[in-house]
């Protein structure tokens, strides 16, 4: 049986198999530790019965309550290739959404590469919609051009009028994101 539990510092030494996917954004250890220190409830790992890490979600709470922009943000969601297509990503997203509801969020958002249609379709199946396109959000390597991202959102129960998911009519640049 899969165990969903809080991510711990020790997991930083055990999750490389998950991060090997070329579509997974990886960060330095201080970045992960910052999330672990500031938003531990938003950092969840899935562990197989034998102790192998299957996947994780890392997020945070951010935004302005006064402007109805307080929300949960998915910084990273990744599942090891051998554990995909089992509903694990959906379960991790559901947990982050529940935490965001309890924290009084208006919505949950995330950024995803426009080219990652598998992920885009999964998020749409989970109730997310494209709020805006962010031009050249992802930096490329090997001389490739930078890649655009979709900022996808799902309204939570506090956003009764679903204002947070009304799509913007034009793309934005990364520096225009608050």
From Swiss-Prot:
EC primary class: transferase
GO terms under biological process: N-terminal peptidyl-aspartic acid acetylation; N-terminal peptidyl-glutamic acid acetylation; N-terminal peptidyl-glutamine acetylation; N-terminal protein amino acid acetylation; regulation of actin cytoskeleton organization
Superkingdom of origin organism: Eukaryota
Annotated PROSITE patterns: GNAT
Subunit note: Component of the N-terminal acetyltransferase B (NatB) complex which is composed of NAA20 and NAA25.
UniProt disease link: Intellectual developmental disorder, autosomal recessive 73: A form of intellectual disability, a disorder characterized by significantly below average general intellectual functioning associated with impairments in adaptive behavior and manifested during the developmental period. MRT73 patients manifest global developmental delay with hypotonia and mildly delayed walking, impaired intellectual development with poor or absent speech, and mildly dysmorphic features.
Protein name (Swiss-Prot/TrEMBL): N-alpha-acetyltransferase 20
Source organism per UniProt: Homo sapiens
Upper classification of the organism: Eukaryota, Metazoa, Chordata, Craniata, Vertebrata
Chain's gene name: NAA20
């Amino acid at each position: 049986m899969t165990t969903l539990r809080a991510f711990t510092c020790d997991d930083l030494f055990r999750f490389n198999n998950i991060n090997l996917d070329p579509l997974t954004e990886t960060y330095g250890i201080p970045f992960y530790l910052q999330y672990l220190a500031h938003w531990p409830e938003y950092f969840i790992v899935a562990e197989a019965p034998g102790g192998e890490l299957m996947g994780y979600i890392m997020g945070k709470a951010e935004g302005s309550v006064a402007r109805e922009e307080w929300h949960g943000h998915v910084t990273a969601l990744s599942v090891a290739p051998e554990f995909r297509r089992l509903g694990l990503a959906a379960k991790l997203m559901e947990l982050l959404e529940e935490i965001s509801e309890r924290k009084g969020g208006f919505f949950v958002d995330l950024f995803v590469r426009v080219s990652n249609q598998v992920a885009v379709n999964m998020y749409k199946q989970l109730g997310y919609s494209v709020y805006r396109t962010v031009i050249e959000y992802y930096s490329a390597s090997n001389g490739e051009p930078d890649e655009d991202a979709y900022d996808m959102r799902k309204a939570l129960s506090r956003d009764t009028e679903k204002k947070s998911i009304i799509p913007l009519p034009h793309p934005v640049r990364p520096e225009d994101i608050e």
